[in-house]
Amino acid sequence: AKKIIGIDLGGTSVKFAILTQEGDIQEKWSIKTNILDEGSHIVPDIIASIKHHLELLNLSAEDFIGIGMGSPGAVDCFEGTVVGAYNLNWKTVQPIKKDIESALGIPFFIDNDANVAALGERWKGAGENQPDVVFMTLGTGVGGGIVAEGKLLHGAGGVAGELGHITVDFDRPFDCTCGKKGCLETVASATGIVNLTRRYADEYAGDATLKRLIDDGEEVTAKTVFDLAKDGDELALI
């Protein structure tokens, strides 16, 4: 039986899997995402990595029914293009489907990363193949995918499930990468944790380690805050 290649494209790494049509993973690997030069290395790196692994495993294009990929940004699943994936440095329209199909000769399908995560969770995870599933992704930002009556909702502009850009903070809104203010992901994500930590640090008068790091201009990430919270840091626990 023919197999499937799955690709999860992220700002830090690109994860690959070869799986059966039943969804069982047979091989998996990852490469670093090179976002230099406006992300122009990303697709060539993906193509080279797949070619390399097919050679290693003695497989060819004929062994696959298709490649499915989840990508950040606004994805046109019909044209197979991505635009506005800022964490990949992709500012202009990227013709991913055309490039990958012409290089590998395997049919290629792409959608927004949160949408394909929703489909995957419905198929093999907590969704248990129910017709209606809402899935949220939490990381650098907040994303989401919505399956209604067995079909993925794309909505106008392909952003139906992008829950991270609902405005929730009207009092003291932070700027969001999307250009608006007060979006959910400015307070409830890895980015949001850092935003709020900096705000609370300004108002906090104690001698917590986290306060010292911020005052000294050290880089503070969500992981820093979590690690210090585990150690009982007063500011991290606010």
Residue ranges and their predicted role:
Residues 20-21, 71, 112, 148-149:
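A cytosolic small-molecule/anion-sensing beta-strand core signal
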Residues 3-48, 81-84:
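Short glycine-rich, Thr/Ser-proximal phosphate-binding strand/loop in the N-terminal lobe
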Residues 128-187:
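Glycine-rich phosphate-binding loop of actin/hexokinase-like ATP-binding domains
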Residues 8, 113, 139:
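Active-site glycine-centered loops adjacent to acidic/histidine catalytic or metal-binding residues
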Residues 39-48, 63-67, 73-134:
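Glycine-rich phosphate-binding loop and adjoining helix at the ATP-binding site
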Residues 8, 20, 77, 147, ...:
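Short, acidic, Ser/Thr-enriched surface-loop or helix-capping motifs
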Residues 35-62, 180, 184-187, 195-238:
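Adenine-nucleotide phosphate-binding core of ATP-dependent small-molecule kinases
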